[in-house]
Structure formats: C-alpha cells, structure tokens
Amino acid sequence: MIIESIKIHNYKIFQNAEADHIPNMAVFLGKNGTGKTTFFDVFGFLHDCLEKNVNSALSKRGGYKEVISRGHNGEDISFVIKFRPSHNEPLITYELSIGLDENNRAVVKNEVVRLRRGEKGAPWIVLRFSCGVGVAAEGELKQYDDVRLAERKEQTLESPDILAIKGLGQFKDFVAISAFRKLVEDWYVSDFRIDAARERKEAEYGEHLSRTGENLSVVTKYIHENHPEIFQEIVKKMKQRVPGV
C-alpha cells in the first residue's frame, strides 16, 4: 500500500494543505502547534468514520464545530487521497467530503473512488455517493477489469453518515478498496515511551511494536530469532550512530 499524496481541506489547522510525492518513509518536522499530530490524526479520523460513522468520528473530537477550520463554519471538511495497492498497480483516488445537512447533522456530502490505468483516458468511476445515495459498480468485484466491465447501478446506504466503502458489500474483496480499508482500519499513532520500552516481557510474543513500545524487548527477540540478517544490520547501524554500542 503506497500513499502518493493527500489533500486536506477545513480539518482543524489545515484549511487548505497538500502533501505530494510522499516517499515510503517520511519524517515531518515542525514546532509545537504547527499541525504534526493533526496531520496524522486525519487517518485516525478516517479510521473512526470507517469503523462507525462520520458523526461518531466528529463527536470523538468535540463535534463538527471543533473540527472545522476556524472561520469556515458551514463549509465541508474534505480529503483527497491518492494511492496504489502496490508499485505496479493503477493509481486510485479516494475523495471524501463531510458537511452538515438541514438538521445540522453530519453527513457524507461526497464520496468518490476512481482508478486510472495509464496516463491517458478517463478514469473509471468505482463509486460516487452523496448523502447516502449514489451509483456503484455492481457484481462480483475482485480485479480491475471486473470494475471496468461492471454495470453501474443506483444504490442507497442505511444512513447518510456511513461511508460507502464500508456499507457496500460487493467491495470487500476488491483489491483497490480492500487495501485502502486495511490501511485505515489498522492505522494508529505510536506514542513511544522510553520508560515502557525498558521493561522486559520475556513470556510474550510480538512481531510489531505496540503503540507505547513496551514490547520492544519481545520484538527484538523475534527479529533476532527469525530474521538474523536484519538484526545484524540494525546492530551495525546502531554502532554507527550510537557511541558505545
């Protein structure tokens, strides 16, 4: 899963921001209050939207008025994410806009998934929804050609605050959407704590670091036993950067 760019509009401090040509590993630096945590919370917000709905995600952050950029009440919060499931696969664009209806309840104003194969030609619209109603590719969708050949039919979601990529069952096995859903569902922000990382938990098992890093010794043991060449490379780089290792 490779995210190439992300646009953010009216999400807290980011009234209009874009990160383009994002590498596989990126470092974001800035003073306190410049939006580093808010930038990563975008994925936390999408995670909560996908797990439940947009009203739940907004409520978790104090409601629409606390999330919308200052001075832009009544406008929509929107995101545009461009990604590829892998290097050689088509570029997928996911667009999401969230706003208030006539009852001041948050709804999905616009949700679009489209993909492009090659540099020329119009993109294929996978789905396009607004306020719970829209059109989507119909049938058994697994490969890209399945979407290209599929008939588009109008459909209605259970609620206008639910994401279509969650509410439409035909997309659960489609590689483009399943990869994006997995990224969003598995997303979390680590808060690495050095005191917790010093703890030793020999009896546990872990392949990945936890959010606070308290299982560092367990993951280190796993790498040492299962990937010795990677472990030696880590030690080599530590010796270059940390005196006395």
Named regions from a protein language model:
Residues 9-11, 69-71, 86, 155, ...:
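Generic marker of residues within folded, mature protein domains
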Residues 88-236, 240-241:
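Electropositive, glycine-dotted interaction segments
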Residues 69-79, 210-219:
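Short, charged low-complexity intrinsically disordered segments located at boundaries
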Residues 79-86:
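Short beta-strand segments that buttress and anchor functional surface loops
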Residues 46, 81, 96:
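Hydrophobic/aromatic pocket-lining and membrane-interface residues
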Residues 244-245:
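Short acidic amphipathic segments
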Residues 4-7, 32-33, 38, 57, ...:
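Short linear sequence motifs
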Residues 1-78:
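Pre-Walker A-like glycine/lysine-rich segment at the N-terminus of P-loop NTPase domains
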